[in-house]
């Protein structure tokens, strides 16, 4: 009988303590949507000839911008695709860099440059056209972002 009372008391105390103590590791970040800056694919760097294949950066990319208030940064999420048009299928893998240039509003000063190496693996089949979808993120200081930035995209 005493064992049962002790077990009931133990479980009741454990339950009450676990419900009343907040998680000390829990962090709340306030994130809000932000207007995205102007962006453009650089004309000369929108496609790339790789011998038996042509890589192309289509213009149907999508930007989503978020302000992370407690860190004072703006995160820009870039959804884009790379198209591969095969002339002949000799290779199964192609490498390309997706490059993002961040400039000031006047396009005179390059603030930052981000490079993302992309590995495009082709499966053996009869198709000649492949679409690879990607998502990359960049982070810009809020003060820099508020002073005005532009984004330029390229592949090489």
Regions found by a protein language model. Give the residues of each.
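Bacterial Sec signal peptide processing site at the extreme N-terminus
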Residues: 18-35
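Post-signal-peptide N-terminal segment of Sec-exported extracytoplasmic proteins
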Residues: 38-71
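Short, solvent-exposed beta-strand/turn "edge" segments of beta-rich domains on protein surfaces
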Residues: 54, 63-77, 86-92, 140-144
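One-face residue pattern on beta-strands with alternating periodicity enriched for small/polar residues
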Residues: 75-81, 152
């Amino acid at each position: 009988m005493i064992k049962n009372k002790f077990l009931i008391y133990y479980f009741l105390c454990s339950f009450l303590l676990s419900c009343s103590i907040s998680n000390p590791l829990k962090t709340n970040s306030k994130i809000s949507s932000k207007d995205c800056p102007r962006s453009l694919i650089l004309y000369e760097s929108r496609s790339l000839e790789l011998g038996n294949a042509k890589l192309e950066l289509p213009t149907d990319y999508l930007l989503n911008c978020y302000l992370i208030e407690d860190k004072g940064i703006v995160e820009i999420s870039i959804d884009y695709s790379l198209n591969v048009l095969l002339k002949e299928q000799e290779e199964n893998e192609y490498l390309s860099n997706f490059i993002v240039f961040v400039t000031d509003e006047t396009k005179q000063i390059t603030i930052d440059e981000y490079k993302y190496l992309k590995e495009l693996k082709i499966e053996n089949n009869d198709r000649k056209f492949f679409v690879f979808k990607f998502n990359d993120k960049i982070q810009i200081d809020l003060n820099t972002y508020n002073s005005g930035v532009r984004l330029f995209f390229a592949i090489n």
